[in-house]
Amino acid sequence: MNKKKIRKLKIISVGRLSKEKGYDVIIKALSKLQTKDFSLTILGDGPEKKKLKTMIKDYNLQKKIKLVGFKRNTSKYYKRANLFINASHFEGFPNAVVEAISHNLPVICSNSQGGIKEIILNGRGGDLFRVNDSNQLSKKITSYYRDPKKLNKKLFLSRINIKKYSILEHVKKYQNIFNNI
């Protein structure tokens, strides 16, 4: 967790490269940042890869944004980052968000339908922005860059919250059910 001002934003986003994942929104938001001291690593593959590469080139962000493809072991990428962004239009159970939190990364997520709001406690455990709103996302990123303490405090709440999704917690719940039969 970052306690001081961040020298360089090292952003990560993980998921299938498809329209509903909102990677175009992240790219647009990054193109609007005042600071150019950032990098974005996107892990995943999918039908939008060519379009995203074109967008990255159009915004002249080739040196800032890397599409690294699908990776089985994502841990080393999470460890290199200091911020996670999820811009999905809708999301069932966002495993990548839980993984990011478990790697001590503060998260900025769209307020999409699905499990994101539950995991980050309706914004108390991370920052939320309106779906498809690259302007608002850009402001959230800038806010984190200027004052990482605020989002890192929210990370603490998220880390407590995601414990209920651990395997150990599920085993305890099943044991309780079987003990009451």
Q: Language model features by range: what are they?
A:
Residues 70, 89:
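Aromatic "clamp/platform" in nucleotide-sugar-dependent glycosyltransferases that forms part
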Residues 82, 104:
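A short alpha->beta transition loop at the rim of the catalytic pocket in nucleotide-sugar-dependent
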Residues 122-134, 143-148:
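Conserved acidic donor-binding segment of nucleotide-sugar-dependent glycosyltransferases
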Residues 106-110:
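Short hydrophobic beta-strand element within catalytic cores of glycosyltransferases
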Residues 99, 112-123, 127-128:
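Short acidic/histidine- and often glycine-rich active-site loop of Leloir-type glycosyltransferases
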Residues 53-69:
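Nucleotide-activated donor-binding/catalytic signature segment of Leloir-type glycosyltransferases, i.e.
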Residues 9-32, 43, 47-53, 95:
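A conserved mid-protein helix/loop that constitutes part of the nucleotide-sugar donor-binding site
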Residues 167-181:
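C-terminal alpha-helical cap of glycosyltransferases
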